[in-house]
């Protein structure tokens, strides 16, 4: 299934860049980790993200200040670099295509990379951690930043804490199964919308050919399909209820998700109005009532005009809000717009 393919990609997208790690390990230096003790960090924002990435970097640094001794086996104190050259530079980027340090090694799903620095490694400063920040929930970007800093501290994908270092999406995202349920329901809603649109355009074809009676069942089929969108949105909302009170709630962009649900309901209502109006127009035309047919057709046109002004959220948009990052083209967008008569 397409969903499984996409989600497999999303799992890789949350990982660092393992092949680059091997390159850095091959250079030996003094005993001990080169960042043990105090290390300075500079955050460089090269993205259009709306998040406060300076604060996010500070939060990621604070996590390892508290956790490095437990998980990496040595104390580290990350602090912001002032005017001096930093030991570590965190670069926040817009997309995978901007990843420079692991471009030749990584797959297209990677959303961050950093060198794996083991004890005894000789390094050239600054060490660079790259993180894709645009169009991702705050908590998702934070986890990726913590993950890449973990690599710099010598931790791999099999090390604890799993919710930071694992490259398995199930380990990284709380309520993962419910996220998948939400995305599944939205994908079905999108497919249902496309089915309705195809039926609508078939009805318009019969209408334009003067086959008004033959158009009636097609517009009724359209109405049924568009009305069913609301049921699928309701299923998505029910699954999303699991996000209330979950750990690390900022790994889901709740406002964006709720906005998507509301917009999909509005789209469904307008599409149902258009379908019902065209069915009534076809019935009137079949009965020879030209004025009523024209009036109902105008009603449908008004609903379609309002519908065309709405930026309908796609499954990919919802996937990003859920932290199930999908950088694929939005499938079905062209098929999802009803045609006019």
Predicted regions and their residues:
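N-terminal export signals
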Residues: 2-20
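Fold-level signature of zinc-dependent metallopeptidase catalytic domains
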Residues: 24-60
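Acidic helix-start/capping segments at beta-turn-to-alpha-helix junctions
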Residues: 39-45, 73-98, 167-171, 248-255
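Second-shell loop/turn segments in exported
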Residues: 43-54, 131-140, 214-215, 286
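Metzincin-family zinc-dependent endopeptidase catalytic domain
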Residues: 54-144, 152
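Structured segments of extracytoplasmic/periplasmic soluble domains
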Residues: 60-71, 148, 152, 156, ...
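Metalloprotease/metallohydrolase-associated module, dominated by Zn2+-dependent proteases
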Residues: 119-121, 126, 130, 135-136, ...
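C-terminal amphipathic alpha-helix
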Residues: 146, 189-192, 196-212, 273-341
């Amino acid at each position: 299934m397409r969903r499984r393919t996409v989600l497999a990609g999303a799992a890789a997208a949350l990982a660092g860049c393992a092949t680059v790690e091997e390159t850095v390990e091959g250079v030996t230096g003094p005993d001990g980790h080169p960042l043990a003790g105090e290390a300075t960090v500079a955050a460089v924002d090269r993205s259009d993200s709306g998040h406060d990435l300076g604060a996010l970097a500070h939060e990621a640094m604070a996590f390892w200040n508290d956790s490095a001794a437990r998980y990496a086996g040595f104390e580290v104190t990350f602090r912001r670099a002032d005017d001096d050259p930093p030991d570590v530079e965190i670069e926040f980027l817009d997309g995978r295509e901007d990843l420079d340090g692991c471009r030749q090694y990584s797959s297209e799903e990677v959303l961050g990379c950093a060198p794996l620095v083991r004890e005894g490694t000789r390094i050239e400063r600054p060490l660079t951690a790259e993180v894709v920040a645009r169009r991702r929930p705050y908590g998702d970007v934070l986890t990726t930043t913590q993950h890449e800093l973990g690599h710099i501290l010598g931790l791999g994908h099999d090390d604890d804490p799993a919710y930071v270092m694992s490259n398995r999406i199930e380990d990284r995202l709380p309520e993962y199964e419910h996220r998948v349920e939400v995305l599944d329901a939205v994908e079905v809603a999108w497919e249902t919308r496309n089915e309705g649109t195809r039926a609508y355009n078939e009805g318009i074809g019969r209408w334009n050919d003067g086959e008004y009676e033959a158009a009636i069942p097609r517009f009724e089929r359209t109405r049924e399909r568009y009305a069913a969108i609301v049921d699928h949105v309701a299923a998505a909302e029910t699954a999303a209820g699991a996000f209330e009170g979950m750990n690390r709630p900022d790994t889901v962009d709740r406002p964006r998700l709720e906005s998507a649900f509301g917009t999909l309901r509005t789209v469904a209502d307008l599409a149902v109005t258009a379908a019902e109006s065209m069915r009534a127009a076809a019935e009137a035309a079949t009965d020879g009532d030209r004025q009523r047919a024209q009036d109902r057709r105008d009603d449908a046109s008004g609903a379609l005009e309002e519908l065309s002004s709405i930026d309908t959220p796609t499954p990919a948009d919802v996937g990003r809000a859920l932290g199930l990052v999908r950088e694929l083209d939005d499938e079905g967008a062209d098929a999802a717009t009803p045609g006019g008569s």
